[in-house]
Amino acid sequence: MAAFYALPSFILERAFLRKAPRALGETAAVIFTSGSTGEPKGVVLSHANLRANIEAVAQVYQFKAEDRILGALPFFHSFGYTVTLWLPAVTGTAAVYHANPLDAKTIGSLIAKHRVTILLGTPTFLTAYLRRIEPGQMRSVSLVIAGAEKLRAEVVAAFAEKFRVTPLEGFGCTELSPVACVNIPDV
């Protein structure tokens, strides 16, 4: 209890004082990206941008109460920020977090321990998982979505063969909050 009182007042105020509701058009985040141009820029995303993107993804995949998302994508990237931070929070989907997406040994252990059902990552991360995660650790995973870079056919084939789940590809950019389109299962 003493540690609670040691917190700075601005943290206590933020945690316990009600804030005025935010308008959907207000800025929710500024995500920095160099995108395809190579020129760094800050992309302003509104609450409406994020909400629409999250609702669209949730509508496509229709998450179930027993689903668990592995959140290993960095929050400074729009893919991680939207689908591994905010999507679970908004949809009520459970999430398991790990700070290093290339720590495949720990990722595999977390997937098995928490029976993760949804894995989101880049093709680079999926390639690392192919090398270092055992098939038994991935038994609970029923949905894999890759984004942020091109998903090569050989990675899809190797992942499907080793783990018995076919990665789906998403496309987007930071300016789109970030998901523009995604493959859907069973099509």
Where are the model-predicted features located?
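Conserved AMP-binding/adenylation subdomain of ANL enzymes
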Residues: 51-68, 78-117, 132
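Conserved S/T- and glycine-rich ATP-binding loop of Class I adenylate-forming
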Residues: 27, 33-36, 69, 75, ...
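Structural detector for helix-capping/boundary residues
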Residues: 25, 47-48, 73, 114
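Gly/Ser/Thr-rich phosphate-binding loop
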Residues: 116-121, 130-187
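Conserved pre-ATP/AMP-binding loop-to-beta segment of ANL
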Residues: 2-32, 39, 62-68
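Short beta-strand->loop structural element characteristic of the AMP-binding/adenylate-forming
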Residues: 1, 8, 42-44, 71, ...
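Conserved structural elements of the adenylate-forming
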Residues: 6, 11-13, 43-64, 126-130
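Conserved AMP-binding A3 loop
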Residues: 28-52, 180-183
